[in-house]
């Protein structure tokens, strides 16, 4: 039996088939994505593997369908039901801004217009006590009116429901009994945190995605059933865990950024296999460049993420769910180079995407992209694109890049390298955002480069950041899909709990955590996870008294009855605050605002097969004809290597190009690449 993972990207759809033991992938496929119907690309990628679906026990899927729907605004009509007096929470938002000094700042546009934000009677106070009964007649009347006006989905977010969810649950039950045609989402099924604006934004996004994700997943399940797939379809969540297709249809907001998460799972697993604790994941695909961190062998998460769209402005829409901490910028192989009104050259964030794609694809694209520039520079070989399965035309690439060279009256090669010289520092800056701006020195980390376009730029980025160790993973173009096969089951639980740290009762805290874990244990048992594979991770959100934001602290395994436990929490918060913000106030009073439990159902660990060992010098059959490559302002004669024929212990000295079916690695002068026992390339300065 085998395990299958399929990852939909903005440009390509990747599939990996792995044996049951979790060793090296058996089969890989990479084909262009199909934006008109993403499920078609999934099926095509499976068919390309030429493996019978009835031999596959599990199918894990990472998708960008929900993310793309939000960005593009392709929603079905939805409405918001909220407590009387809170109709404009979505419009008021928060007073803080990403950039306080932007004179052209614009607030996010509400995701639901005011005429579809409806108030209903009923009230619960902040202690969870009902002060006014839910007005059922008012609810029915207003829902009926909304449906008559074409509303297909309802989001319900009532004030203080995090403290008592009975009104939301009652409203949902009444609507489903009386109006079965409309889909309903309530905020407390997603999160029980305070922060009214963020909770409202989250449930609204969930409601907007209900129809889209239901239609997509039902269609996909029908197609894979036709291929005789006997198992369950599982999806990657934004928190890095697995969820069933049934749950994804109910809470689709958890699939946002699902397609990006596989990469960090792969980086974490690779680190564990190689014995590395601290890594930077650098994923460059066709549309974006994504940065993630693994610190102490675990990936970083954030209690809330934001998604930016044309209507959200620079702040983005908040989504109040735990998520892998990913920083993405619009720099990928398909990113378009363009000149602004001041004659400055930019790269991205606009992308040629899968259709029409870079000019070299010959599918109607005419604008110069990063891929076109690399073809012009000789860093990519046209005949080797996707192993020769996809035809690209270097002349089309030259014609596109010539727009830039003609504008600046410069040589074609200089213009092409100019595009790369803008793209690479932009990606380095994205890594600085995740490291330097948080008090972390990237030079202390190992950078793991993957994605189809990643290895081509990895050495350039590392040189910019003075990172001396870079790993180019095996199967870089399918690395994220492989990472999905390493995912565990995971659900996150959050409970608002506001308490001064000095007054904290450890027995009460233990009781609250135990209650959450009891609920989580029952859920995992129902999903067939054995007790021996269950793991619970406790965290608390803490802030200085009077602050409006909190930091999340992982709790140690020390018994809560330990007398030094509160002091340890206090000290660790001060240390994290100093690292993150460059200041702290150890003598300032602190308060806990939320308790968190990550319930994890561990799956079978993955491993990698080793490759044959050779001498320091690569064998002759690993050599391909040399060619001139434009690097650092001049043409250089570069040795070209076939990565599939390299052996462990081989060493390659730059400048050189290492080619494989789905990616190409550029090695600069004064750098050396060593092949390890698994086939990874370790790039270091000579």
Outline where the language-model segments fall:
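Glycine-rich phosphate-binding loop of actin/hexokinase-like ATP-binding domains
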Residues: 15, 20-34, 79-85, 105-108, ...
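Conserved short loop/turn motifs at secondary-structure junctions
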Residues: 54, 155-164, 206-209, 416-422, ...
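C-terminal, non-catalytic interaction/recognition modules in large multi-subunit enzymes and RNPs
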Residues: 8, 137, 141, 145, ...
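Conserved phosphate-binding loops in N-terminal lobes of ATP-dependent enzymes
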Residues: 5-8, 12-16, 27-28, 32, ...
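Terminal amphipathic helices with adjacent charged low-complexity linkers/tails
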Residues: 157-203, 207, 384, 555-559, ...
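Metal-dependent DNA phosphodiester-chemistry modules and their immediately adjacent helices/loops
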Residues: 188-224, 482-511, 515-516
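Glycine-rich beta-strand-to-loop/alpha-helix junction loops that act as flexible
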Residues: 63, 157-159, 187-189, 238-239, ...
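N-terminal glycine/serine-rich phosphate-binding loop of ATP-dependent small-molecule kinases
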Residues: 1-78, 125, 132-155, 168-187, ...
């Amino acid at each position: 039996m085998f395990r299958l993972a399929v990852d939909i990207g903005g440009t390509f759809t990747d599939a990996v088939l792995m044996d049951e033991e979790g060793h090296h992938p058996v089969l890989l496929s990479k084909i262009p994505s199909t934006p008109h119907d993403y499920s078609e690309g999934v099926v095509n990628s499976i068919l390309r593997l030429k493996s019978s679906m009835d031999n596959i026990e599990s199918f894990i899927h990472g998708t960008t369908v929900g993310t793309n729907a939000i960005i593009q605004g392709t929603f079905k009509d939805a409405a918001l039901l909220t407590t009387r007096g809170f109709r404009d929470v979505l419009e008021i938002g928060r007073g803080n801004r990403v950039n306080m000094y932007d004179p052209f700042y614009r607030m996010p546009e509400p995701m639901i217009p005011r005429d579809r934000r409806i108030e209903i009677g009923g009230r619960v106070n902040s202690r969870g006590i009902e002060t006014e009964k839910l007005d059922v007649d008012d609810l029915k009347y207003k829902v009926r009116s909304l449906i008559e006006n074409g509303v297909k989905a309802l989001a319900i977010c009532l004030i203080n429901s995090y403290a008592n969810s009975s009104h939301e649950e009652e409203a949902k039950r009444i609507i489903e009994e009386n109006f079965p045609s409309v889909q309903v989402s309530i905020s407390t099924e997603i999160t029980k945190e305070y922060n009214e604006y963020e909770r409202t934004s989250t449930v609204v996004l969930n409601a907007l995605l209900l129809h889209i994700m239901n239609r997509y997943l039902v269609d996909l399940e029908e197609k894979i059933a036709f291929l005789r797939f006997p198992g369950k379809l599982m999806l990657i969540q934004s928190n890095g865990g697995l969820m069933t297709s049934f749950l994804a249809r109910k809470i689709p907001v958890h699939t946002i950024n699902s397609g990006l998460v596989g990469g960090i799972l792969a980086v974490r697993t690779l680190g564990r296999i190689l014995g590395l604790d601290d890594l930077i994941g650098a994923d460059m695909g066709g549309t974006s460049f994504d940065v993630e961190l693994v610190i102490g062998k675990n990936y970083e998460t954030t209690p809330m993420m934001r998604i930016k769209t044309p209507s959200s402005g620079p702040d983005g829409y908040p989504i109040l769910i735990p998520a892998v901490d990913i920083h993405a910028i619009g720099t990928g192989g398909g990113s378009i180079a363009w000149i602004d009104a001041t004659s400055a050259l930019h790269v991205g964030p606009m992308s040629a995407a899968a259709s029409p794609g870079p000019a070299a694809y010959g599918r109607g694209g005419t604008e110069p992209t990063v891929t076109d520039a690399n073809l012009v520079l000789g860093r990519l070989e046209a005949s080797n694109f996707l192993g020769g399965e996809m035809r690209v035309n270097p002349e089309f690439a030259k014609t596109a890049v010539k727009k830039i060279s003609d504008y600046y009256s410069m040589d074609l090669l200089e213009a092409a390298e100019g595009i790369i010289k803008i793209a690479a520092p932009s990606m380095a800056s994205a890594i600085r955002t995740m490291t330097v701006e948080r008090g972390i020195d990237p030079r202390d980390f190992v950078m793991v480069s993957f994605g189809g376009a990643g290895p081509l730029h990895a050495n350039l980025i590392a040189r910019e950041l003075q990172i001396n160790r870079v790993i180019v993973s095996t199967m870089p173009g399918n690395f994220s899909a492989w990472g999905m096969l390493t995912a565990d089951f995971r659900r996150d639980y959050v409970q608002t709990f506001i308490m001064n740290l000095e007054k904290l009762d450890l027995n009460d805290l233990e009781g609250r955590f135990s209650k959450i874990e009891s609920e989580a244990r029952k859920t995992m048992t129902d999903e067939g996870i054995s007790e021996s594979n269950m793991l619970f991770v406790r965290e608390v959100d803490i802030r200085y008294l009077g602050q409006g934001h909190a930091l999340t602290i992982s709790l140690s395994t020390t018994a809560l009855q330990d007398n030094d436990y509160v002091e340890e929490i206090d000290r660790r918060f001060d240390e994290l605050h100093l690292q993150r913000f460059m200041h702290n106030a150890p003598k300032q009073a602190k308060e806990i605002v939320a308790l968190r439990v990550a319930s994890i159902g561990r799956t079978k660990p993955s491993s990698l097969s080793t490759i044959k060992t050779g001498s320091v010098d690569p064998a002759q059959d690993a050599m391909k004809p040399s060619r001139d490559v434009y690097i650092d302002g001049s043409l250089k004669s570069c040795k070209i290597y076939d990565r599939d024929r390299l052996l462990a212990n081989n060493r390659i000295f730059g400048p050189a190009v290492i080619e494989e079916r789905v990616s190409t690695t550029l090695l600069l002068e004064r750098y050396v690449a060593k092949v390890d026992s698994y086939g990874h390339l370790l790039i270091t300065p000579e």
